[in-house]
Amino acid sequence: MLMGEYQHNIDAKGRLIVPSKFREELGEKFVVTRGMDGCLFGYPLNEWSQLEAKLQEMPLAKKDARTFVRFFYSAATECEIDKQGRINIPANLRTHASLEKGCVVIGVSNRIEIWSDERWHAFSDEAEENFDELAETMIDFGF
């Protein structure tokens, strides 16, 4: 299971250190794509395969489904962890997530998320302010 929050920097070449606690579960290669809320999602290959199977079941006749699948897949890239524990994040994904220097890498169960410092702290601050109300809504999901 992927969990935790780690601060790292992205270098001028777009390389980011993958937290050592995540490397074994992610494997030598994993898929990074656009995420929601202005971050990037990173999936181990086995999780990506399961997600692909679900996406292939989306109804092609529905415009929203086509749009989502196109947008999600078009940015997906397989990243390989180098000997220094880094991945190279393509420019289009760095732009999507506003990654410039400081980054936060978090584990979210079966995936990682890569955030710019600024976006993560804004998101985190808002979530913390509303945590009690948010927790209350989890009842609707059977939590």
Swiss-Prot record:
Primary location class: cytoplasm
InterPro entries given in the database record: MraZ, MraZ_C, MraZ_dom, MraZ_N, MraZ_sf, SpoVT-AbrB_dom, SpoVT-AbrB_sf
All copies of domain SpoVT-AbrB, residue ranges: 5-47, 76-119
Gene3D superfamilies: Transcriptional regulator MraZ domain (3.40.1550.20)
Gene Ontology molecular function: DNA-binding transcription factor activity; transcription cis-regulatory region binding
GO cellular component, one term: nucleoid
Pfam families: MraZ
Keywords carried by this UniProt record: Cytoplasm, DNA-binding, Repeat, Transcription, Transcription regulation
CDD domains referenced in this protein's UniProt entry, alphabetically: MraZ_C, MraZ_N
Subunit description: Forms oligomers.
Protein name: Transcriptional regulator MraZ
Species this protein is from: Enterococcus faecalis (strain ATCC 700802 / V583)
